Amino acid sequence: MRPLRHPSPDEITLHGILHALADPTRLAIVAALKEQERCVPPDGGDGINCVETMERVKQSLPKSTCSQHFLILREAGLIRSERRGVELFSRLRCRELNERFPGLLQSILSAHAASAPVEAAPVKE
């Protein structure tokens, strides 16, 4: 299999990031990957695969659509993916993104979290 291409930090553009995150599904994927970061070791851990990520985002998409979303995020420089067997495990490139565009990703994810619909609490009878 051919190696995966990841842009260098200098190749990551603001336009590419904003374009990738303009899609609500991709924004939700990035938010899920950011949440996963809190559960793994500081070195970034192993990341999570497409199926696990989509379960976290509570969406059911065809595998090809999911793969396309991850490709766009990878080409924009938002995620780093590693192939293990037939699966790809992805994680955010937070440190590199923050060095290139300080505070950008956190600001976008904070705004996303603030605008997310709040689930109603169950009504007690």
Regions picked out by a protein language model, each given a short descriptive name:
Residues 69-71:
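Short, hydrophobic-biased segments on the C-terminal half of alpha helices
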Residues 1-2, 52-53, 59-63, 79-81, ...:
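N-terminal start-of-chain detector that recognizes signal peptides
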Residues 1-13, 31-42, 89, 93-125:
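Amphipathic alpha-helical dimerization/coiled-coil segments
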Residues 74-84:
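A short, conserved structural fragment
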Residues 1-4, 25, 62, 73:
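Short, intrinsically disordered low-complexity segments
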Residues 16-20, 24-62, 84, 88-96:
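N-terminal helix-turn-helix DNA-binding core of bacterial DNA-binding proteins
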